[in-house]
Regions:
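A ubiquitous, low-specificity "background" feature that marks scattered single residues
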Residues: 8-11, 30-31
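Bacterial N-terminal signal peptides that target proteins for export
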Residues: 1-9
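Hydrophobic helical h-region of N-terminal Sec-dependent signal peptides
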Residues: 12-16
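C-terminal motif of bacterial Sec signal peptides marking the signal peptidase cleavage site
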Residues: 18-21
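Beta-strand/loop edge motif enriched in small/polar residues
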Residues: 23-211
Length: 211
């Protein structure tokens, strides 16, 4: 099945149910590919092709392992695709906990054989924040994702706090995965959340499927 067809099937199911900095050189999460002109996460200006799939204009694609030393914010209108087998490691020894804030769309396309792994370097609960999806985030697919050691408390400089996505006071950690667009769609399929300090999932809106 083509990537686009698989995503469409997962999101159709959701509708039916409820009618950074990068330390390693192999991928820069702030560019749409390895030589992407410092576009600050704005996505590609042309169709992107990788060994796995072809992605539409406006895409960010992470094809290889990466280490985040600061938060990543995906703007409205931009889609981030994380390909099978990719490991994203969040550094814990930072002043502002790492968060993946999705104001656009996110597709973690792991498989049973090659899951997407999102973890931390020291492997302790609350090492990093979580995946926080904004009020305009239309689609999120987490397919075969192993997510661990999230739940850190945000600071006033955290993008989740500045965008008022979860906490308006600094009184506790963020969830490992939070979705809050009442008109959005999300799928969490064959995922493993573990060693998380706060809530594993938290939903304040949207149409979703979890299985």
């Amino acid at each position: 099945m083509k990537l686009s067809n698989k995503i469409a099937c997962l999101l159709f199911a959701a509708t039916a149910v409820v009618a950074a900095s990068c330390e390693n050189d192999n991928i820069n999460p702030y560019d749409y590919n390895n030589n992407g002109d410092n576009n600050q996460n704005q996505g590609s200006t042309e169709v992107l092709k990788t060994a796995m799939a072809e992605y539409p204009v406006g895409s960010l694609v992470w094809t290889k392992d990466t280490t985040l030393t600061e938060s990543v914010e995906i703007p409205v209108g931009t889609s981030l695709y994380i390909e099978p087998g990719v490991t994203v490691t969040c550094k814990s020894d930072v002043k502002v906990p790492v968060e993946i804030v999705v104001l656009g769309n996110l597709y973690c396309m792991g498989t049973a054989e090659k899951p997407v792994t999102i973890t931390s370097d020291t492997k302790k609960p609350a090492d990093w924040g979580g995946i926080i999806c904004g009020y305009n985030s239309e689609e999120v697919v987490l397919n075969h994702v192993d997510l661990s050691y999230a739940g850190a408390t945000p600071t006033e400089s955290s993008p989740s706090f500045q965008n008022k996505l979860f906490k308006t006071t600094l009184d506790g950690g963020v969830p490992a995965f939070h979705f809050c667009n009442v008109n959005g769609k999300f799928v969490v399929a064959d995922c493993f959340f573990h060693d998380v300090y706060n809530d594993q999932t938290y939903f304040t809106g949207g149409q979703g499927v979890i299985y």
